[in-house]
Amino acid sequence: MSKPVVAIVGRPNVGKSSLFNTIYGERISIVHDTPGVTRDRIYAETSWSGRDFIMIDTGGIEPDTGDDVILQQMRIQAEIAIETADVILFMCDLKSGLTAADEEIAVMLRKAGRPVVVCVNKSDYVGEQPPEFYEFYNLGLEDVCAISAAHKLGLGEMLDLIISKFPPADESEEQDETVRVAIIGRPNAGKSSLSNRLAGAERSIVSNIAGTTRDTIDSHIENEYGSFTIVDTAGMRKKGKIEDVIERYSMVRALAAVDRADVCVILVDAEAGVTEQDARIAGLAHDNGKASVIVINKWDLIEKQTGTLETMEKIVKDRLPFMDYAPVLFISAKTGQRVDKLFGLIKTVYENSKKRLTTSVLNKMISEAVTQVPTPQDKGRHLRIYYGTQVSVQPPTFALFVNDKELSHFSYERYLENQLRRNFGFEGVPIRLLLRNKNGEED
């Protein structure tokens, strides 16, 4: 099931990042930081009272000089968060009191019609709040709570309010073999064009279904390769002077799409090359264990010389080294060049993500691998692998039972991963290795 998204919005310096970091630092049911964006730490997957959700910190949008720029930043921040989130957590500052900027944001939130919880930060009072707290009810938003992010007061009540606004949990997930495909990439990489090309090229589109993300459209397609649902995240077309804000929220759309997908199509603009943002988006797919295909779009616009394709392939491998297992396809969504090859690759990596190895086959490979390259040692003690077994799929995950996992080394684990790929394929799929001591302790 797709996780609800909660966006923290508010003017600068009201404590958005402080609240986010308090939750992160105290590990209040935090599952893990969303991979690929830990440097910014603006996304975290969280659970409260049995409901998983994604929290977004819109911190880091600091004002430039001039009130107009500040208001522009707040407006862009709030608008994009509204589009992305299922629930808005609107943070204000009790010590500063109700401000004109708070009122302007509240106007936008009321017009949007999204569920909102007003969170008044920097309240160190237990029980009855001071008169200035009740001024925030004048914002015209029904749910108002008081917290202190710094002193960890009121967080439970705030989280209870948030999850009460979530859509009902839908347990009726698809059980058929429909492959959910997320097309992710930077703004203007061609996500919408590719989605339209894939849908338009097929005569057997069953339906267009409104997706769980507000402006996402899911296209259901059937062809000779099977049944596919394309999750298009191309609704993000806003232009603005605050480009970093736009790019940060393109990550939110990618995050929501990745969460729902079986396979990720990572779309790269051939003219722009592989950027840092591309690497971070690809990291979402890799670290969430998704089968992936890297697609270089707009290849028709690149002037070709001998070795041009090979050069681009090398650039992709160099800048996305953690995804060296993913196939690379060069296309033009605009002209349709080589787009017909994409469904075959999607089907292949999907099937690889669900591949299971018997314990006997796996242990035969491990034995041969250890014979070829002995396990690492430390002070005369060798790592000993007693046996291995596959514990899950999507991604393929293998538990190796050992004498002492501290004797292992990432380079040897990488060697074992390479042996798995050499013997069994797994193209397009990350592989997870879990080292467990005989007492059950896990790496």
State where each predicted segment sits.
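C-terminal-of-GTPase-core extension/linker across diverse P-loop GTPases
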Residues: 1-14, 20-25, 30, 98, ...
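Bulky hydrophobic/aromatic packing residues
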Residues: 49, 79, 110-111, 353
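Hydrophobic or amphipathic alpha-helical targeting/insertion segments
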Residues: 117-122
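Switch I (G2) and immediately adjacent beta-strands of P-loop GTPase domains
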Residues: 33-69, 75-87, 211-241, 259-263
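Hydrophobic alpha-helical bundles that form the membrane domains of multi-pass transporters
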Residues: 56, 60-110, 137-139, 143, ...
